Amino acid sequence: MRPQYKDVNDKLDSTAKHKTNSHGGRYDNPYVHITSPTSASDKRSKDKVLEVLNRCGKKVEDATRKAEALVGGLKDHLKFSPSISDAAMARLSQGTKMIVEGGPERVFQREFGVLAVEKLLDSFVCYISTTSGPVTGVIYISNRRIAFCSDYAIRLPSSAGGNGVAAYYKVVMEWEKISSISSSTNVLKPSERYVHMVTRDGFEFWFMGFVSYIDAFNCLNKALLNSRCNHAM
């Protein structure tokens, strides 16, 4: 039976604290990777964003129209952010980044490299639960693994106090490491749906705020099933 939680946020917090404690920017969780951005690459990215916004107004308009068709999913996505304006800007920045880089496959390859005979199946905008709150980004689903990367560098807590360092939050799991993927719903707010992943060594991850929840959940389960079938052959 899939879990149904009266207060999913309590469950998210307890799970995150149990398995993703930070120690000065380093994480006990072997699937979490922290990548510090370089000022040069950030400047190039900003320059490219401005260039695309200036040259590709039509593409941005087309993308906006498509987004409006998913208004329900977008509302569910944006409400997980403490700032709707920040979430909207993150989505615009991510969409522009995809145009600049030539699509999600190239972004995936640049951020995570490529494994042998790996093929990207799909990617979805979502949030991941962390001890610091929901982090917006994109989850990439390939035939070999799932990978998440935050849209922008976030401030990570420091054991010495202070503001900590700004870094990209990434999660990478190969399919053979994943034990289960399930769906859960906040019974007090049925529109809030979550994807719960558990690894074979007991680590848990919660993803939420999908613009296309059903498509994402089905894609994840199909990829997990195909991976198990391939390993059984």
Swiss-Prot record:
InterPro entries: GEM-like, GRAM, PH-like_dom_sf. CDD domains: PH-GRAM_GEM. Disulfide bonds: none annotated. It comes from the Eukaryota. Residues 106-185 form the GRAM domain. Pfam families: GRAM. Residues 1-16 have a biased composition (Basic and acidic residues). Residues 1-45 are annotated as: Disordered. Belongs to the GEM family. This is GEM-like protein 2. It comes from Arabidopsis thaliana (Mouse-ear cress).
